[in-house]
């Protein structure tokens, strides 16, 4: 087995040409904590002579405080680059390494084993073709081994190397290796891997890493690197349907219009017909432009600019596709979701959903079940906690373009983003569109919002009163309702307690129920605004994310957030319904301000302080604001 050595300058062109012709294998190392993932990759790189001398010298200095066995270099330090990783002796972030042998190029992602960093493992696995799953010979299959195996399968990885590591610590016994391999294959039978290759390894000493070890004469299979060089991958994405997400419209002069991006799957040639996925507009490829000159054909992974034969309405976020094999365009679908955030995923809560081409508001309409990663059983659940996996129905505010994830990883995935923090809180793999998306259509009506509001001589608005229980929301809203009614305005007041007697009588006060409570009320308020009414919504609505969701349902300028700011002590002193007394005594659970948080508005349209003015004066302030608001319109 030969490896790349230093190349003389005069042979550089030939070397690069040879290098470009090699296939690329992307793989990850994963498994439980301290199974030796980073050490294995470090050993592979060192023994294959793919690490420079100065790197090894530097590792000796960096690792001196944590060196083992009288100064032996800790090979894991080749991958663990963060200071916290070196201090704790664990992997936290995903570490990528690029290397090549005479047969193949490799991109390896060393992923963390701690459950806390599952999100980083998902990141590494999302583009991998193969997973090297490590198991400590002394420990056997652990929960995190199962978790990583399931996630690898879920993310479309088809090939697995089962690296049974630290085989030296069980005296290289074949019986231990055979038992672990047998148990893992039985466990993984339902995961659908195309191949599983068990290999006994002692990563610290290099046994079976790049060559066969004399310590395991009973093992007749390939060494790790030999297997990585020869494993047959799935068919290339060029055989899949053509998908081209438009990233930029190139318009350097009046005579040129091109659509720039990277081909997500498939291939395209000059003259091929294409269609814009959402609009259905058709054209054909006139030219394929690159920095190095025009091409006749381009394939998956290439960054190109496509010039079309016709003038079409395409912009950033559109997708050019093959007319004979179009993706789905729908606003409802089923997906597997892996949750990353410490705050649980709640059905009814609004998130930002981002795909290759779209960024839209989305809601989990149903959590069908949670997946038990040990047994793969489907278990009922009302929410997903951090690192849990569930199957969900998802609804988006506008149709998006997608493929089933099993057909196209690039166009079948998405992430959930928190509306308040902008943190990525979950990742999803789309299974299929829901048929209801095709069967439910908007019914056009002749009388619209403009006609209804004109008849009432008023501008529709949603006045959203938020604040603690006892802050005075309903009192102020009621006073304002009287003022507006006296002026002949058409209003309606939605009060939290009143709505719970009917529409929301089935909801409690858990975080999930509060989210659904606000979602329903926001939709009702939207319908009332569409009827031309001024809607007064008086709800605690403790979460910023739900209030933002309500705002985005309305037209621009229609939603007016009113923060009724009363100190908790004052609310408890008033306690008109004796709720604080019960909450403080532990008789009411999940009570806002006592045992459940309240997220105050950061930039409300109106900020009212009830300890400074009486309800009527505050209602007059809101009335004056509405008058100015109408004039500005």
Curated annotation (Swiss-Prot):
Region span, Adenylyl-sulfate kinase: 459-633
Claim: Nucleotide-binding is one of the keywords in the record: yes
Pfam families: APS_kinase (PF01583), GTP-eEF1A_C (PF22594), GTP_EFTU (PF00009)
Location of the tr-type G domain: 22-236
UniProt-annotated stretches for the region G1: 31-38
Catalytic site positions: 541 (phosphoserine intermediate)
Source species, domain of life: Bacteria
Catalytic activity: sulfate + ATP + H(+) = adenosine 5'-phosphosulfate + diphosphate; adenosine 5'-phosphosulfate + ATP = 3'-phosphoadenylyl sulfate + ADP + H(+)
Enzyme class, first EC level, given as a word: transferase
InterPro entries, per database record: APS_kinase (IPR002891), CysN_GTP-bd (IPR041757), CysN_II (IPR044138), CysN_NoDQ_III (IPR044139), G_TR_CS (IPR031157), GTP-eEF1A_C (IPR054696), P-loop_NTPase (IPR027417), SO4_adenylTrfase_lsu (IPR011779)
Segments for region (G2): 89-93
Any one Gene Ontology BP term: hydrogen sulfide biosynthetic process
Region (G5): 202-204
Family: In the C-terminal section; belongs to the APS kinase family. In the N-terminal section; belongs to the TRAFAC class translation factor GTPase superfamily. Classic translation factor GTPase family. CysN/NodQ subfamily.
The name this protein goes by in its record: Bifunctional enzyme NodQ
Taxonomic source organism: Rhizobium sp. (strain BR816)
Gene: nodQ
